[in-house]
């Protein structure tokens, strides 16, 4: 196979050759930044004047209420039939790219390996530019063989009547070429390990089995896990029994399960009696929460009952949960700022601050930064602001926002179960504001259908501040602010029927002769 060299970058040359032969390709790289720069390099070599692509690039640009520099970068690439794809993009943008690649409008996608996982997006060529990625203190490490198989599995499109597909690995030298051949083409894939070996997963499953009455005793639990991949792989089941016994002890201590005996029993004795979940344990299981997280939330809420809390108190609590990991990391230049915010909110926090010498202190500071970002969103700062100030991409922020909403919903439910009515309203308000990204003053307006934070702020600035104002405001003014259809819909939502004025007819005095 002969590829014309039109640049100094082999992956760019192969991508351009793919377009020249009327095919599509996925270019796999190891970082989000590389995905973007590679897409840009390919697009700069193309001269395309396609109306459909121009319209598509405009759609990409308007995917967010306020386009970021990343949106503009992507839009420019898409106008040439090239795109980048990674977790930092908003979901709507990723969906647009995937759909239009399937349609054949987008010819090249430069992406991270996440695209190969769980997305059916075949291409004629799968180009593996990077088979190594940064592994922390270990430096650059070869990716797993299983991951390589996922990527090469994208090559070939039976639905497009391709007889074959091409998977191309790029090696920097002859020795690396030999290593790639041995490791990936001739090598064996790694073993698959059970997720139950991860303690949070095991905890959740144990509580779930007890809650659904699938397992009513420690013996039934052990019998179940003996038949799992986890039990088979672990080998020494005595060790698994020790782990399960410890987890049962934790669940009992946290109030999520109880035994038939009212008096205290040891961890060994607990296996001889029946296990039952409590109503609180049932709710934790239904919420799909890790029981450890649920206990952490409940402990934090008990502290909240004893002090004056703010929205920041609950945002920082949410940011401390395992489910939000990895958190937004504090950069060196941000330490002073983050510590200043910590000092300002110290008396309102419901999560205990560790010692600065504790290994958990960095994570604690990261939770403060994450809470700051959530609070900025609630203060109606847009995605562009978050990207510029904190280098947080819309896609990543969107994922964290969804997780935080789930944790806050779970917090609400646990507060209800425990009758923590004094703080329930504050938790609900924090969740609503975070979900909608609004200041407190906009809450009444955003409760109306089809009114988001941008429209609500526009109404507020023009004197329409609550439902009462929506009732009072003239339909003409409302139409000027929101458009005719939405203005009439809003009036209908509050129970007011407005008769539409026929086209060509005006209401009121038409001239001096009518005075």
Sequence positions of predicted segments:
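Conserved interdomain linker/interface between the two RecA-like ATPase lobes of SF2 helicase motors
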Residues: 1-36, 83
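Conserved C-terminal RecA-like helicase domain
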Residues: 28-108, 137, 141-146, 226
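A short beta-strand element within the Helicase C-terminal
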Residues: 108, 115-132, 166-168
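Conserved segment of the helicase C-terminal RecA-like domain
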Residues: 144-181
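C-terminal helical accessory/scaffold domains
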Residues: 203, 208, 245-254, 258, ...
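Short acidic, hydrophobic short linear motifs in intrinsically disordered regions
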Residues: 214-235
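Compact, charge-rich alpha-helical regulatory domains located at protein termini
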Residues: 430-500
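Acidic, low-complexity intrinsically disordered tails
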Residues: 501-515
